C-alpha cells in the first residue's frame, strides 16, 4: 500500500531511501530483483495516478466477460466452455474517473487448471504488478479461491470480491449465496465487499417453430461501475491510496 507523500519529499527520494535501507546479500538482490523493480514501477504509477486493475479468478468464471461489460464492447476474447485467456493482457479503459489520469484493465489466466505451486506464483505475481484485484466468483467460494485471496491480502493487495452470473439465481438465493461466501472468508478478509453482477446474462428465447435458443442480454455491472466511479474514495477505502 502506498502512503501519502511526506511534505517536501518526492517519491523518487523516498524510493531511493527505501532501496538503500534494504539489507540484502548479493544473492538476495539478484533473487528479488524482479519484485523490487515491480514495486518501484507501482510507486511511480500511483504517484502519477495511473491505476492497473486485474480481473482474477478460476477458469470460466467470466473474467473476460466482466471486462468487456465495463468496456461496453468486446475487447477481450471469450470462450464460454473452457475459458480462453492464456496470459495477462491489459487495455486502457477510456472511462473518465475523477483524480485518475488513466486506468488499465487487465485480464489474467484462470487459476483452477494449473498446479498448486504455479497457482500460488500467479497470485503473487498479480499482487506485485496490479493496484486493485477483482477476484471473480461464479458460485460459493472454493478452497482454491480462498488460498489465492489469502496470498493477495498477505501481500498487501486491495481486493474486491465479485459474484458473477447472478442472473442464474432468484434474489433470495443470491442473498443466501453472498452470506455463505462471507461465512467462509478467512478473518483477514471479513471486511471485503462482495458485489453482485451479471457480466454476460442470457435468457431462453422460444421461436415460432418451437425451438428454444439462448439469447444474450444486456450486462448488469452497474454496481461495480458505480464503485469505481467513486474514484479516489474507492481506492482509499480499498487501500490503493492512503
Question: Each predicted region: which residue ranges?
Answer:
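Catalytic P-loop NTPase motifs of RecA-like helicase/translocase cores
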Residues: 112, 143, 169
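Short beta-strand/turn micro-motifs composed of small residues
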Residues: 57, 137, 163, 198
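Canonical P-loop GTPase G-domain recognition
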Residues: 167-239
Amino acid at each position: 500500500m502506498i502512503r501519502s507523500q511526506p511534505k517536501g519529499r518526492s517519491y523518487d527520494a523516498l524510493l531511493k531511501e527505501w532501496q538503500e535501507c534494504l539489507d540484502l546479500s548479493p544473492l538476495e538482490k539478484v533473487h528479488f530483483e524482479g519484485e523490487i523493480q515491480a514495486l518501484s514501477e507501482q510507486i511511480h504509477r500511483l504517484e502519477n495516478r495511473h491505476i492497473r486493475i486485474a480481473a482474477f479468478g478460476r477458469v470460466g468464471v467470466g473474467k473476460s466477460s466482466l471486462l468487456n461489460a465495463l468496456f461496453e464492447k468486446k475487447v477481450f476474447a471469450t470462450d464460454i466452455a473452457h475459458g480462453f485467456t492464456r496470459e495477462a493482457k491489459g487495455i486502457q479503459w477510456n472511462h473518465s474517473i475523477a483524480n485518475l489520469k488513466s486506468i488499465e484493465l487487465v485480464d489474467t489466466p484462470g487459476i483452477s487448471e494449473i498446479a498448486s505451486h504455479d497457482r500460488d506464483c500467479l497470485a503473487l505475481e498479480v499482487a506485485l504488478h496490479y493496484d486493485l484485484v477483482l477476484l471473480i466468483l461464479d458460485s460459493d467460494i472454493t478452497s482454491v479461491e480462498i488460498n489465492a485471496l489469502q496470498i493477495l491480502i498477505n501481500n498487501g493487495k486491495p481486493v474486491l470480491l465479485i459474484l458473477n452470473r447472478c442472473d442464474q439465481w432468484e434474489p433470495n438465493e443470491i442473498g443466501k449465496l453472498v452470506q455463505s461466501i462471507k461465512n467462509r472468508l478467512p478473518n483477514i478478509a471479513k471486511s471485503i465487499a462482495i458485489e453482485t453482477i451479471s457480466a454476460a446474462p442470457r435468457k431462453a428465447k422460444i421461436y415460432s417453430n418451437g425451438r428454444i435458443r439462448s439469447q444474450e442480454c444486456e450486462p448488469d455491472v452497474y454496481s461495480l461501475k458505480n464503485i469505481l466511479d467513486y474514484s479516489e474514495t474507492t481506492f482509499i477505502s480499498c487501500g490503493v491510496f492512503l
